[in-house]
Regions:
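Phosphate-binding site recognition
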Residues: 1-336, 340
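A cross-kingdom feature that marks ATP-driven nucleic-acid transaction machinery
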Residues: 305-441
Length: 441
């Protein structure tokens, strides 16, 4: 798949490159796996304006890794390094020395993998960076996919690289407008049902969008056929990513995510399931990993107990529901039955994805300053999307329905009255109500 969009990110990265020609800069580029960090770096810097060196860090002995990286550095930068570097610190020093002579960009891909190869590398980099960065012109960008490790490396004040980065860019999945642009390029006559299917299985993550587009899987049926095919790369993806992300705590986190996906969404339910306190694990799933969202009614108190947890990543929602839950069928070689079940349940399952789509679209269109859902404690009244524009002093209340014929305007008006009864300070704001359906995508 060719490169699409990312104009804001490209502008920021190229601005940093310009600044690095005065003094070295150290940028951390992070985001979930498969979101397109490597491709973004290449698009931003591999344009011939200054030399661009990309060094991918892989899981192998440091001596072997350094030999490969030194060979690549010598090829791209035409370095004349005497001897063979056996430690990355030795190679990094040579690369910093080169930046004394000329400006260039160095991208280190999967930077967190040094934690497995040799965690001492981070201390080596810190000492060398401190020695050289004020007298060199290096645009250093480190890419990392594992939030747990990247947060530890750069934002834990006990770690050597704490405070060394001069900037941080978090790359998000494609938003609705860019996803539509990509889909239109491959299938100009796509339908909104096709778009909803693509959003549901990919969540806008570049790798999974590419997976579908490259396979010419443009309809729901074609996407499900691709996902559950014998050669599918989608099936093992969830377990692979989570094992890397969670490390030794993999079992606990995996159990929590599976339970939340199955409908056990309150702290009490999850505590009973594991037989231990889960608050710390849930907080990390939300704050560090961005896989889970703690949902509570908009305008509610942060300490409110009227809250529940949801898997907030469309890919993982789909993977836990139709891959992990049906793993017994996969073990029997019956991916055809997995596909049939996904086809049968897709309409109900994709309702939440449609709600997330419209939430993302409203935010992307800058149509609010606060957005969320609202429900009362008894669960009798629930509004899918509530938006507030604090500048215009307005509110909007939306029901999200795949089938527009199921929308009940009178019932929504009753829910809005219940909302104002619980939030009387909002009653004087101008407001509107409406339906958001598949036709509005």
């Amino acid at each position: 798949m060719r490169f699409f969009g990312r104009e804001i990110e490209l502008k920021e990265l190229r601005k940093v490159r310009e600044l690095s020609q005065e003094r070295s800069r150290f940028t951390v580029l992070t985001g979930r796996r498969r979101v397109g960090k490597t491709e973004l770096s290449r698009e931003a810097f591999d344009d011939g304006k200054t030399p661009y060196l990309n060094l991918p860090i892989t899981r192998q002995p440091e001596v072997t890794l350094c030999a490969q990286l030194q060979e690549e550095a010598e090829r791209v930068l035409h370095l004349g390094i005497h001897g063979t570097c056996t430690r990355f610190g030795e190679l990094f020093r040579e690369l910093m020395k080169e930046a004394e002579r000329r400006p260039y960009t160095l991208v280190i891909d999967e930077f967190q993998e040094f934690d497995r190869t040799n965690p001492g590398v981070y201390g080596d980099i810190q000492h060398i960076w401190d020695e050289y960065h004020n007298k060199t012109k290096l645009n250093l960008v480190v890419n990392g996919s594992v939030n747990r490790l990247m947060n530890k490396i750069f934002f834990d004040d006990s770690q050597p690289l704490y405070g060394r980065n001069t900037g941080t860019l978090i790359l998000k999945p494609f938003g609705p407008s860019l996803l539509k642009e990509i889909f239109r390029c491959y299938k100009p006559d796509y339908t909104n049902s096709d778009l909803l299917a693509l959003w549901t299985v990919s969540g806008g993550v570049a790798r999974y969008v590419d997976m579908m587009m490259s396979a010419h899987a443009f309809t729901k049926a074609e996407m499900l056929e691709e996902i559950f095919s014998p050669l599918s790369a989608y099936i093992p993806e969830g377990r692979t990513i989570l094992a890397d992300e969670f490390g030794s705590d993999y079992g606990t986190y995996f159990t929590l995510l599976a339970a939340i996906s199955a409908g056990q969404t309150t702290s009490a339910e999850l505590k009973n399931l594991l037989g231990t306190e889960v608050g710390g694990f849930l907080a990390k799933l939300e704050d560090q990993y961005s896989i889970v969202e703690k949902k509570q009614p908009i305008f509610g108190k942060p300490t409110s107990k009227n809250a529940h947890f949801q898997v907030d990543d469309c890919f993982f929602r789909f993977w836990f529901r139709f891959v992990h839950k049906l793993s017994y069928l996969n073990e029997l070689g019956r991916r055809d039955r997995m596909r049939d079940i996904a086809e049968r349940d897709f309409g109900v399952f994709s309702g939440y994805a449609l709600e997330r789509y419209f939430t993302a679209k409203i935010v992307e269109d800058k149509g609010c300053t606060r957005i969320g859902s609202w429900w009362d404690r008894k669960g009798e009244n629930e509004i899918d999307i509530v938006c507030e524009d604090e500048i215009a002093e307005t509110l909007a209340f939306y029901e999200v329905k795949i089938d527009a014929s199921r929308f009940d305007a009178t019932r929504l008006a009753e829910k809005v009255e219940a909302f104002f009864a619980k939030n009387p300070d909002k009653r004087n704001l101008h407001y509107k109500t409406g339906l958001l359906s598949i036709g509005d995508m």
